[in-house]
Amino acid sequence: MAPNLRKSHPLLKTINNSLIDLPTPSNISAWWNFGSLLGICLATQILTGLLLAAHYTADTTLAFSSVAHTCRNVQYGWLIRNLHANGASFFFICIYLHIGRGLYYGSYLYKETWNTGIILLLTLMATAFVGYVLPWGQMSFWGATVITNLFSAIPYIGQTLVEWAWGGFSVDNPTLTRFFTLHFLLPFMIAGLTLIHLTFLHESGSNNPLGIVANSDKIPFHPYYSTKDILGFILLLLPLTTLALFSPNLLGDPENFTPANPLVTPPHIKPEWYFLFAYAILRSIPNKLGGVLALAASVLILFLIPLLHKSKQRTMTFRPLSQLLFWTLVANLTILTWIGSQPVEHPFIIIGQLASLTYFTILLILFPLIGTLENKMLNH
């Protein structure tokens, strides 16, 4: 009998073991679709980004007009740009839902998979930030100025570090060219890290909504979950194309229709919606270094989540108190996102400070506390 090429070929068997014959729990829900959706987001962003890069010029005098030229004169350039800009938003929607799923179902107990995931999140955030600067509009320029300036809060080396990052004494041409370089490079780094992320995941196999070992009841990934993934792709690409075609500027900042001007500061400097929660935490501390540390902690705190798991059950499926706390955290992040978009004045200042405090309290104190309490309740 001739050997099955799919199972014997050195390259094909790797693909087979990852996407075709992969043993998968039979009860994973739609919340497990977001991994593959993130893959589709990455592929879409790399494809549209490559086409945009072919028409883009990374120079302060030409960047803005080169983007305008792409939208006006390049065949379907407007569509490529709109898909790329809004694709970033969908990338973040998917990654936040993916992380939320991981938190709710205790997937963070696969420590290596979780940690590589956080590194992926940080790389994605860096990519989105440098990409936002490229069209060289007002908010691009001032966003870059404000955020890079935060590094100057680092004691002793701060100012040197910022000037080194800028390539001068302010955000200027060298900054733009290096940001373009980074924006081109980082997505491929994300693709590489994704493979590491998947390698770690396939060491243990997928978690499932019950949080129990599912080895006794696993099914092949194809055709069951491959079909389910295709449905997910359709449900992702439909709203993306709808947004890109009907309301492409809905999530953008009107300031970016004005070319960058170092002499005029916009009245309200704010990042894209997906960074607003972190921006609100940064602004809630009236001290530069303190704010920067809180900003870093708001994302890096995810590294501590596996250490703070005190429950005897893995998932929150049968833990109503933890569920309540989880949805409180979601509401809290929504409040932070809203506060980040508001001006720094009463009552937004105090709301932001309280929401920031609540964010860290829930993650660092209340989750382990409630987990321990639920264990005690189970014993009685």
Curated annotation (Swiss-Prot):
A ubiquinone binds at H202. It comes from the Eukaryota. The chain crosses the membrane at residues 34-54, 78-99, 114-134, 179-199, 227-247, 289-309, 321-341, 348-368. Binds 2 heme b groups non-covalently. One of its GO terms (molecular function) is metal ion binding. It is found in: Mitochondrion inner membrane. It is a multi-pass membrane protein. Its cofactor is heme b. GO terms for cellular component: mitochondrial inner membrane; respiratory chain complex III. Component of the ubiquinol-cytochrome c reductase complex (complex III or cytochrome b-c1 complex) that is part of the mitochondrial respiratory chain. The b-c1 complex mediates electron transfer from ubiquinol to cytochrome c. Contributes to the generation of a proton gradient across the mitochondrial membrane that is then used for ATP synthesis. The cytochrome bc1 complex contains 11 subunits: 3 respiratory subunits (MT-CYB, CYC1 and UQCRFS1), 2 core proteins (UQCRC1 and UQCRC2) and 6 low-molecular weight proteins (UQCRH/QCR6, UQCRB/QCR7, UQCRQ/QCR8, UQCR10/QCR9, UQCR11/QCR10 and a cleavage product of UQCRFS1). This cytochrome bc1 complex then forms a dimer. Belongs to the cytochrome b family. This is Cytochrome b. It comes from Eudyptes chrysocome. The gene is MT-CYB.
